[in-house]
From Swiss-Prot:
Binding residue positions for heme b: H89
Record's protein name: Hemoglobin subunit alpha-1
GO cellular component entries: blood microparticle; haptoglobin-hemoglobin complex; hemoglobin complex
Native species: Cottoperca gobio
Tissues with expression: Red blood cells.
GO annotation (BP), single: hydrogen peroxide catabolic process
SUPFAM superfamilies: Globin-like (SSF46458)
Biological role: Involved in oxygen transport from gills to the various peripheral tissues.
Annotated positions binding O2: H60
UniProt miscellaneous comment: This fish has two hemoglobins: Hb1 and Hb2. They display the Bohr and root effects.
Ranges of residues in domain Globin: 2-143
N-acetylserine sites (modified residues): S2
Amino acid sequence: MSLTEKDKAAVRALWGKISKSADAIGADALSRMLFVYPQTKTYFTHWPDLSPGSVHVKKHGKNVMGGIALAVSKIDDLTNGLMELSEQHAYQLRVDPANFKILSHCILVVVSIMYPKDFTPEAHVSLDKFLSGVSLALAERYR
């Protein structure tokens, strides 16, 4: 699913509003993923504490949203813009790419809760398409 110029503008506008809370969004989204989809915990067995609000969850949530910030800045060419992250997740971390969609869904949920007035139906569809594009770009090196 390709992003239209209208989608890109909507994502940039929404990111402009939510980026100040990116760390909290990332931590909450990651916490939700680990709780709702417990099979995702297998990637974090080296963490002593996977509970919401733990230091490791907060730190990785911040890293995730740093990747989203990068994706927003590379929105016109997600595949090439996220190639390094794709290689890292494919070759070093060996994350099942299905998990990108799971985390994307959790990000949508958190943004909708934290920014209900800004999360209009139009913003929702544009952010969903964008996160799908990010997931696809991250899965590029798995092929």
